Amino acid sequence: MKDRYILAVESSCDETSVAILKNDKELLANIIASQVESHKRFGGVVPEVASRHHVEVVTTCFEDALQEAGIVASDLDAVAVTYGPGLVGALLVGMAAAKAFAWANKLPLIPINHMAGHLMAARDVKELQYPLLALLVSGGHTELVYVSEPGDYKIVGETRDDAVGEAYDKVGRVMGLTYPAGREIDQLAHKGQDTYHFPRAMIKEDHLEFSFSGLKSAFINLHHNAEQKGEALVLEDLCASFQAAVLDILLAKTQKALLKYPVKTLVVAGGVAANQGLRERLATDISPDIDVVIPPLRLCGDNAGMIALAAAIEFEKENFASLKLNAKPSLAFESL
């Protein structure tokens, strides 16, 4: 049987990425051009800057992916692209490149939801068993998703305010840490103790909604008041206390969801899934009867490899889009 090759494009935020997937789950290439250095001085992603960087490198990413995979355009069977959610300007750059490439090479276009990509990155670890529950944690999203079968997603809980990754970056900025702050906070947290006792919003309520704005505000107020009074704060303990509160919230809601939706598999994905503290808590707090599947670190952040892994499923269902496909920056799972 002829091998199948899918080229995937991801540009929803501040990474330009192009990947090549062979057959169902063999990633031959996953080129990622990161913009982190460009956004550090701003303390966050500047949409206009992100869009310009995508324009500068996207063609090179296509070339590098094909070269690394050892194939040419005529070997490809489809092109997949993230069409939302994300920054509209950033999405449009990747979509324009993907659509032009698909048109020039007479290839079908597969539209992929960015968050579905994060979820399906877990396919790199093992073939997923359905139905399953997913905890998706990133800079822009915090969601619990019930997946009855491949491609059938239902959000059963989400944040009412800040996403968990956003909260990490905001408190990191207050402490003077480098953007993005998640990894550094995680490392410092492992050296400290939970001594500041921050609030855990809605942790005892039965619903599956999250909230991190109160935790963020409590952290900022503590830090500000200490500065005003000239009191010294222990950085490691601050990070440990903040992370303990975040993880308590995430684990409490996930455990409630597992009781409500009796599944055998829990996928934890998104940029924050790289957090070692979260991985440790999942190992100790989640029942051994639940198969916890977390993508490898290389597939936790934004990358086109995860888009390709999601696209393999959509290809089988012949879920193709016309070249009139437009970016949907606020795309939800229910829109699939």
From Swiss-Prot:
Stretches that traverse the bilayer: none
SUPFAM superfamilies in the record, alphabetically? Actin-like ATPase domain (SSF53067)
Principal cellular location given in the protein's record: cytoplasm
One molecular function GO term is: iron ion binding
| EC code | 2.3.1.234
Family annotation (Pfam families): TsaD (PF00814)
**InterPro entries to which the protein is assigned, alphabetical:** ATPase_NBD, Gcp-like_dom, KAE1/TsaD, TsaD
Name its cellular compartments: Cytoplasm
Question: How, per the record, is the cofactor bound?
Answer: Binds 1 Fe(2+) ion per subunit.
Q: What is a single cellular component term in the Gene Ontology annotation? A: cytoplasm
Protein keywords: Acyltransferase, Cytoplasm, Iron, Metal-binding, Transferase, tRNA processing
This enzyme catalyses:
L-threonylcarbamoyladenylate + adenosine(37) in tRNA = N(6)-L-threonylcarbamoyladenosine(37) in tRNA + AMP + H(+)
- Similarity comment: family membership: Belongs to the KAE1 / TsaD family.
User: What function is annotated for this protein?
Assistant: Required for the formation of a threonylcarbamoyl group on adenosine at position 37 (t(6)A37) in tRNAs that read codons beginning with adenine. Is involved in the transfer of the threonylcarbamoyl moiety of threonylcarbamoyl-AMP (TC-AMP) to the N6 group of A37, together with TsaE and TsaB. TsaD likely plays a direct catalytic role in this reaction.
Protein name per its UniProtKB record: tRNA N6-adenosine threonylcarbamoyltransferase
